[in-house]
Amino acid sequence: MLALSRKKDEAIIINDDIEITIIEIKGDQVKLGISAPKSVPIYRKEVYAQILDSNKEAASSVDVKTLNQLFKK
């Protein structure tokens, strides 16, 4: 993992098209601004974990026989 120090209004660039800027620092919270192409999904880590869990749950509840019947049509 790369660890960088930044101050308010400073930024980092990732892959020429993603810019992360430090907008505000209050105590132990840091507010980030992220500029990226619309094709790049951006999630908070805890939200992304919930999405993955939901996808796994949805995939595991599908009956294989039902899927096979759908694809035969």
UniProtKB/Swiss-Prot annotation:
A GO MF label: mRNA 5'-UTR binding
Coiled coil: none
InterPro entries named among the record's database cross-references: CsrA, CsrA_sf
Keyword annotations from UniProtKB, A to Z: Bacterial flagellum biogenesis, Cytoplasm, Repressor, RNA-binding, Translation regulation
SUPFAM superfamilies on file: CsrA-like
Pfam family, one: CsrA
Keyword flag Cytoplasm: yes
GO biological process: bacterial-type flagellum organization; mRNA catabolic process; negative regulation of translational initiation; regulation of bacterial-type flagellum assembly; regulation of carbohydrate metabolic process
Subcellular location: Cytoplasm
Entry keyword annotation includes Cytoplasm: yes
GO cellular component: cytosol
Main function: A translational regulator that binds mRNA to regulate translation initiation and/or mRNA stability. Usually binds in the 5'-UTR at or near the Shine-Dalgarno sequence preventing ribosome-binding, thus repressing translation. Its main target seems to be the major flagellin gene, while its function is anatagonized by FliW.
Family statement: Belongs to the CsrA/RsmA family.
Subunit structure: Homodimer; the beta-strands of each monomer intercalate to form a hydrophobic core, while the alpha-helices form wings that extend away from the core.
Protein name: Translational regulator CsrA
Species in which this protein is naturally found: Lachnospira eligens (strain ATCC 27750 / DSM 3376 / VPI C15-48 / C15-B4) (Eubacterium eligens)
